[in-house]
């Protein structure tokens, strides 16, 4: 997969705290075990007026015309709380989100997001509030994420974030668990060549 070094995109301001994984992707859509096809069910209860998903809720922010094509999700604290379903980051990624910004994330959701090549950025509540205000006042304008510098540029202001160096390395280089293993392929082959034949 491609590395995520820098990204510019529109922001959806989801003005809610404690958004749980059941809100992100309800349990009735969890039967599938592939990562594709969940985007259309993202925020199902909030996004649609009917169970068949034929009528969009015009009052839900994801349906606002000015946020169509957004790739960055902005939310309040404790994003991704609730059950530890990996389908939640699958749905967000399948919809098109690449980056999430919030004051805090549920631990399992945070790790699942990184494992699925999405970047969850933690900023202070005050900084997140500033970004909400900027997004509301600057419809249609993009913000810029630089993972190499670990900065978020919003208008003329730069915010700095932290990320574990191992996770940063994986995102920058587009590495999943298999890719990480293959980085050590020569060492693995050398080790296996020393194993007695009867143990192979």
UniProtKB/Swiss-Prot annotation:
Assigned protein family: Belongs to the LeuD family. LeuD type 1 subfamily.
Pfam family name, one: Aconitase_C
Known role: Catalyzes the isomerization between 2-isopropylmalate and 3-isopropylmalate, via the formation of 2-isopropylmaleate.
EC number of this enzyme: 4.2.1.33
Catalysed reactions, as listed in the record: (2R,3S)-3-isopropylmalate = (2S)-2-isopropylmalate
Transmembrane intervals: none
Listed GO MF terms: 3-isopropylmalate dehydratase activity
Gene Ontology CC: 3-isopropylmalate dehydratase complex
Quaternary structure, from the entry: Heterodimer of LeuC and LeuD.
Name under which the protein is recorded: 3-isopropylmalate dehydratase small subunit
Entry keyword set: Amino-acid biosynthesis, Branched-chain amino acid biosynthesis, Leucine biosynthesis, Lyase
Single GO BP term: L-leucine biosynthetic process
Pathway the protein acts in: Amino-acid biosynthesis; L-leucine biosynthesis; L-leucine from 3-methyl-2-oxobutanoate: step 2/4
Superkingdom of origin: Bacteria
CDD domains (alphabetical): IPMI_Swivel
Stored Gene3D superfamilies: Aconitase, domain 4
Organism (species): Actinobacillus pleuropneumoniae serotype 7 (strain AP76)
């Amino acid at each position: 997969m491609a590395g995520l070094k820098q990204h510019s995109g529109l922001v959806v301001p989801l003005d809610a705290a404690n958004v749980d994984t059941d809100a992100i992707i309800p349990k009735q859509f969890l039967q599938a075990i592939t990562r594709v096809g969940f985007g259309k069910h993202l925020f199902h209860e909030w996004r649609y007026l009917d169970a068949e998903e034929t009528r969009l809720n015009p009052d839900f922010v994801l349906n606002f015309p000015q946020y169509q094509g957004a790739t960055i999700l902005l939310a309040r604290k404790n994003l991704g709380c609730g059950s530890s379903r990996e389908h939640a980051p699958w749905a967000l990624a399948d919809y098109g989100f690449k980056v999430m910004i919030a004051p805090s994330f549920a631990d399992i959701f945070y790790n699942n997001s990184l494992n699925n090549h999405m970047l969850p950025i933690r900023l202070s509540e005050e900084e997140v509030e500033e970004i909400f205000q900027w997004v509301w006042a600057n419809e249609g304008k993009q913000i810029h994420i630089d993972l190499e510098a670990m900065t978020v540029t919003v208008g003329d202001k730069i915010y700095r974030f932290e990320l574990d160096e191992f996770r940063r390395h994986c995102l920058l280089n587009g590495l999943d668990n298999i890719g990480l293993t293959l980085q050590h392929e020569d060492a693995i082959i050398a080790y296996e060549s020393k194993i007695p034949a009867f143990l192979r």
